[in-house]
């Protein structure tokens, strides 16, 4: 199975630009009900990610007023070397990679590192189960 059948499209995932604030990242996570925000530049090149876990750890570590924390620039805290998968990869490799790295959400990029979408582990498993049920 190709990974492209399991990708959440760009208009259905949290995306912000690298000049956004942490509050915008949280707003996007809440809007799309996902625990990751993808950071892109103007040509959709993936620049980084920040997860709800990253933000939770920052809050505990920083110990500053929430208003000051939320107004900080995302670039101060984002992971600018995220794990990704290529759009041409297959589902088995992708799921093995996610399992091995304990990743729930994996950005999908093309050869130019442009963001294509996101694989969310639970949604991928849901589709796999649906396919198995149909076959039986």
Whereabouts are the PLM-identified features?
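Tandem CBS (Bateman) regulatory domains
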Residues: 1-12, 47-86, 90-100, 115-136
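Append "Primarily bacterial transcriptional regulators
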Residues: 44, 112-113
């Amino acid at each position: 199975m190709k990974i492209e059948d399991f990708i959440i499209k760009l208009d259905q995932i949290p995306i912000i630009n690298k000049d956004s604030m942490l509050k915008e990242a949280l707003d996007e996570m809440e809007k799309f009900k996902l625990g990751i925000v993808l950071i892109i530049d103007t040509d959709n090149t993936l620049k980084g990610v920040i997860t709800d876990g990253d933000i939770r750890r920052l809050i505990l570590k920083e110990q500053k007023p929430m208003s000051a924390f939320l107004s900080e620039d995302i670039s101060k805290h984002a992971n600018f070397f995220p794990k990704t998968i290529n759009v041409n990869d297959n589902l088995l490799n992708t799921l093995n990679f996610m399992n091995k790295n304990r990743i729930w959400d994996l950005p999908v990029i093309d050869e130019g590192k442009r963001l294509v979408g996101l694989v969310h582990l639970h949604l991928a498993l849901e589709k796999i189960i649906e396919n198995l049920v149909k076959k039986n």
